[in-house]
């Protein structure tokens, strides 16, 4: 892997090359005018094949189905990115290259939130003139309703996070709009007029502008809501609306005639049409990218391990790649509610047993990520470097693992189940490497595969299913909801995030010390104090030993020649920014 210095030199050279190309005019027809001609990692620091030309079709493919394309019922990072095409949120991340893309900017709101001194009251003013695809005006009441349905109606919408429920006054008692028919709804969200929305919190929340970027703040008119069926005919507040939607198969988006560029400073909306197809074999997705038959792999996690040699060994193909840090960690979740992982020493045995170097190799080597020792990845604010379960060369320590097994009363090892997502070959290969490591210390792990689209809603994210089927170990990959330690940690280690289904705290970790540390940290109005707090929470989690960090993820992204306005966004897990991207086809 290149050193930071070498990468910086390369990035500088790329920027200079792009500047020289731009001076020559934008009508050049040579390869440097195409998405693939800018050079290796060009998309990390610049917008490749920059264009303001409207027209064409941007085509996406995905190896599985989404949890949902409903902005109020999703937790997948790629859907958060994709849904901005049809759903405007109160705030958003700036569509821009490099670190500029981490800046939070107003979207549906006129400006960032106005906070009270104690960070418990947040006020936003909506832009005037924003309309839904049927021509009706977007109001503050539509934003309020969107939050009510997305956070308080698990009987219909179970996939998204529950930050609003946890932090809004009275959130623990409100039953959601499908059960509570009172016209005022949740009283801690006030809408004194059509342009103003006020949030009253039960505790300080200094990251609220980040929370407002979440797709759950995309407005929903109550009259058009059909609960779980809303996804079949969603209202659009963005530049695109759904022309067709075939559940689990495909969708087509076309221009929203009532979208007004004057009200939307962050969306260029270049393409005339956007299509997405689901359940495409992941290797086929790679082939379609490399043959320029599609614009984007929607998952945004990069080329498959078996595809990588085809691009990395050929200079012209390698020049079309961006090896981005994903701001994400792959880890093994150990269920604290499934024996013998209710015993901390049994969890520590797994920490020492796993040969992380072999896991990295199974994933595809350092192109796909670095060996991890913490839950927080280095690119997220609050990261502190430490390793509580260090082994030589990251290859595991059989002796320490067996000693921990003896301490937990399992000297001969034990049997358990290990889950992975069936449509993610790299994850299955990682699980297979883990299985081999565990076998060396007497732990027999049977791999159970489930589809990613149902992984959290039906299997690993359902505590009753986990216990019934003895799913002691679960493969997991997680990226920050927003790029701070709280935005990364809260929904995966806070006890309040445990849900009947669709949960992401797969360990069912509910440690009062960790829960309090998270609450105390987000209440800090001093940024430096917040940053320090997240590293301390990370250490508490690692001391608990229910999370085995495996890899700080990297994506080997590929940009076909027809793609325009291509740049990596760290705000959305190191994938390409879907708001910017266009196509010459």
What do the PLM-derived regions correspond to, one by one?
Residues 19-22:
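C-terminal motif of bacterial Sec signal peptides marking the signal peptidase cleavage site
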Residues 41-42, 246, 353-384, 426-436, ...:
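Detector for C-terminal structural segments
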Residues 59, 138-148, 194-204, 238-239, ...:
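Alpha-helical secondary-structure segments
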Residues 125, 142-144, 149-220, 246:
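Surface-exposed binding/hinge segments that line
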Residues 240, 367-407, 422-429:
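Structural transition elements
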Residues 224-234, 259-311:
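Ligand-site clamp/hinge motif
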Residues 61-117, 235:
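N-terminal lobe/hinge region of extracytoplasmic solute-binding protein
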Residues 94-99, 175, 195, 200-269, ...:
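Gly/Pro-rich hinge or "lid" segments in bacterial periplasmic/extracellular proteins
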């Amino acid at each position: 892997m290149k050193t930071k210095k070498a990468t910086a030199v390369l990035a500088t050279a790329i920027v200079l090359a792009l500047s020289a190309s731009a001076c020559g005019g934008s009508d050049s027809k040579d390869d440097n005018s195409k998405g693939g001609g800018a050079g290796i990692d060009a998309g990390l620091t610049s917008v490749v094949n920059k264009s303001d030309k409207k027209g064409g079709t941007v085509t996406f493919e995905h190896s599985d189905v989404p949890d949902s394309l409903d902005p109020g019922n999703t937790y997948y990072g790629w859907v958060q990115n994709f849904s901005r095409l049809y759903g405007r949120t109160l705030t958003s991340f700036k569509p821009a290259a490099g670190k500029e893309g981490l800046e939070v900017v107003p979207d549906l709101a006129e400006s960032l939130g106005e906070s009270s001194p104690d960070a418990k009251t947040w006020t936003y003013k909506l832009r005037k003139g924003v309309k839904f695809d049927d021509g009706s005006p977007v109001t503050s009441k539509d934003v309020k309703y969107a939050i009510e349905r997305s956070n308080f109606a698990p009987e219909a919408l179970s996939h998204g996070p529950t930050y609003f429920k946890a932090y809004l006054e009275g959130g623990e008692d409100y039953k959601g709009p499908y059960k509570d028919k009172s016209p005022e709804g949740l009283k801690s969200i006030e809408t004194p007029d059509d342009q103003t929305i006020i949030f009253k919190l039960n505790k300080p929340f200094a990251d609220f502008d980040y929370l407002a970027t979440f797709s759950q703040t995309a407005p929903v008119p109550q009259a058009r809501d059909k609960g779980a069926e809303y996804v079949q005919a969603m209202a659009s507040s963005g530049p695109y609306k759904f022309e067709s939607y075939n559940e689990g198969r495909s969708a087509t988006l076309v221009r929203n005639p009532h979208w007004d560029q004057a009200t939307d400073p962050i969306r260029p909306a270049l393409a005339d049409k956007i299509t997405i197809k689901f359940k495409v074999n992941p290797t086929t997705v790679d082939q379609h990218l490399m043959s320029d038959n599609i614009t984007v792999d929607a998952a945004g996690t990069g080329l498959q391990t078996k595809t990588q040699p085809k691009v990395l060994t050929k200079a012209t193909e390698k020049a079309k790649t961006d090896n981005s840090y994903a701001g994400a960690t792959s880890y093994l979740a150990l269920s604290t509610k499934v024996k013998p992982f209710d015993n901390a020493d049994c969890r520590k045995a797994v920490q020492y047993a796993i040969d992380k170097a072999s896991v990295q190799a199974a994933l595809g080597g350092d192109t796909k990520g670095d060996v991890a020792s913490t839950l927080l990845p280095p690119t997220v604010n609050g990261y502190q470097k430490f390793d509580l379960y260090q082994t030589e060369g990251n290859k595991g320590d059989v002796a320490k693992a067996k000693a921990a097994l003896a301490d937990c009363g399992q000297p001969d090892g034990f049997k358990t189940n290990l889950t992975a997502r069936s449509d993610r070959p790299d994850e299955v290969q990682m699980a297979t490497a883990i299985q081999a490591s565990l076998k060396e210390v007497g732990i027999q792990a049977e791999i159970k595969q489930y589809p990613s689209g149902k992984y959290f809603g039906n299997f690993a994210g359902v505590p009753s299913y986990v216990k019934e089927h003895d799913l002691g170990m679960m493969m997991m990959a997680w990226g920050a909801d927003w790029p701070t330690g709280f935005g990364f940690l809260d929904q995966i280690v806070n006890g309040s995030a445990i849900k009947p289904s669709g949960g992401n705290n797969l360990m069912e970790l509910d440690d009062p010390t960790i829960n309090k540390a998270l609450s105390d940290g987000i209440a800090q109005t001093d940024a430096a104090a917040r940053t320090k707090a997240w590293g301390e929470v990370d250490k508490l989690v690692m001391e608990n030993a229910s999370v085995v960090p495996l890899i700080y993820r990297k994506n080997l992204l590929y940009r076909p020649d027809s793609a325009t306005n291509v740049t990596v966004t760290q705000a959305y897990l190191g994938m390409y920014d879907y708001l910017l991207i266009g196509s010459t086809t």
